[in-house]
Amino acid sequence: WIMGHMVNAIGQIDEFVNLGANSIETDVSFDDSANPQYTYHGVPCDCGRSCLKWENYNDFLKGLRSATTPGNSKYQSKLVLVVFDLKTGSLYDNQANEAGKKLAKNLLQHYWNNGNNGGRAYIVLSIPDLNHYPLIKGFTDTLTQEGHPELLEKVGYDFSGNDAIGDVANAYKKAGVTGHVWQSDGITNCLLRGLTRVREAVANRDSGKGYINKVYYWTVDKRASTRDALDAGVDGVMTNYPDVITDVMNEAAYKNKFRLATYEDNPWETFKK
């Protein structure tokens, strides 16, 4: 999965997919009442990027739905996975459950079209704080109560705070999550970060008894760091330059080992070599 980083304006969806991304990451900011409000990152953000692009969250969802609904004039068949980077740092811990409920209602209405031929992409809810694990239950309970538990088959989870792997496992236990887990590791492209924890996550994924199904590394903008990430065995790389990742994947060392994921590839299944 080549994951386009910080795709917060509707016009950027086509831009990143046309550069080779089959997945995008979108920031979601919340208002004081825990309503998802804008797709907005703000400053500071990655070096070389404009931090200020934004949409109203519901408008972005409608644009995303168009891009991921077969038959729509805006349809992009390659776009199969969306990571919502949930900026819950602005919320009190006791608002996490409420944020999950409201997120579910927004997605149900504006992305899934109330279960009636909505967008088809798989969705990862990425949460920066382990203490905000109740967001997951708020989300899953609400989709079930609204009569659409089947949509949970399209939803996965990530804790993005680079916490110790054991601590992340405990948070999932508390949240009642037993699958559909992506594990992120990374840092802004302005700084360097080694692959120690990535390798630990990959080992957990491949052990057969860990909690992790997929591992992605962010933010990867250079050919050398792309090769390092692929060599470490990641399933996804998040990038500001999808074309760079595409170029590396076409190199002799990688083109027979890796291919771009399609809609037929289940993002919740651990790949067996």
From Swiss-Prot:
CDD domains: GDPD_like_SMaseD_PLD (cd08576). Its EC number is 4.6.1.-. One of its GO terms (biological process) is lipid catabolic process. Disulfide bonds join C45-C51, C47-C190. Signal peptide: none annotated. Mg(2+) binds at E25, D27, D85. The active site is at H5, H41 (nucleophile). Gene3D superfamilies: Phosphatidylinositol (PI) phosphodiesterase. GO terms for molecular function: lyase activity; metal ion binding; phosphoric diester hydrolase activity; toxin activity. It comes from Loxosceles spadicea. Its cofactor is Mg(2+). Its main location: secreted. This is Dermonecrotic toxin LspaSicTox-alphaIA2i. Keywords: Cytolysis, Dermonecrotic toxin, Disulfide bond, Hemolysis, Lipid degradation, Lipid metabolism, Lyase, Magnesium, Metal-binding, Secreted, Toxin. Binds 1 Mg(2+) ion per subunit. InterPro entries: PLC-like_Pdiesterase_TIM-brl. It catalyses: an N-(acyl)-sphingosylphosphocholine = an N-(acyl)-sphingosyl-1,3-cyclic phosphate + choline; an N-(acyl)-sphingosylphosphoethanolamine = an N-(acyl)-sphingosyl-1,3-cyclic phosphate + ethanolamine; a 1-acyl-sn-glycero-3-phosphocholine = a 1-acyl-sn-glycero-2,3-cyclic phosphate + choline; a 1-acyl-sn-glycero-3-phosphoethanolamine = a 1-acyl-sn-glycero-2,3-cyclic phosphate + ethanolamine. Belongs to the arthropod phospholipase D family. Class II subfamily. One of its GO terms (cellular component) is extracellular region. Expressed by the venom gland. Dermonecrotic toxins cleave the phosphodiester linkage between the phosphate and headgroup of certain phospholipids (sphingolipid and lysolipid substrates), forming an alcohol (often choline) and a cyclic phosphate. This toxin acts on sphingomyelin (SM). It may also act on ceramide phosphoethanolamine (CPE), lysophosphatidylcholine (LPC) and lysophosphatidylethanolamine (LPE), but not on lysophosphatidylserine (LPS), and lysophosphatidylglycerol (LPG). It acts by transphosphatidylation, releasing exclusively cyclic phosphate products as second products. It is found in: Secreted.
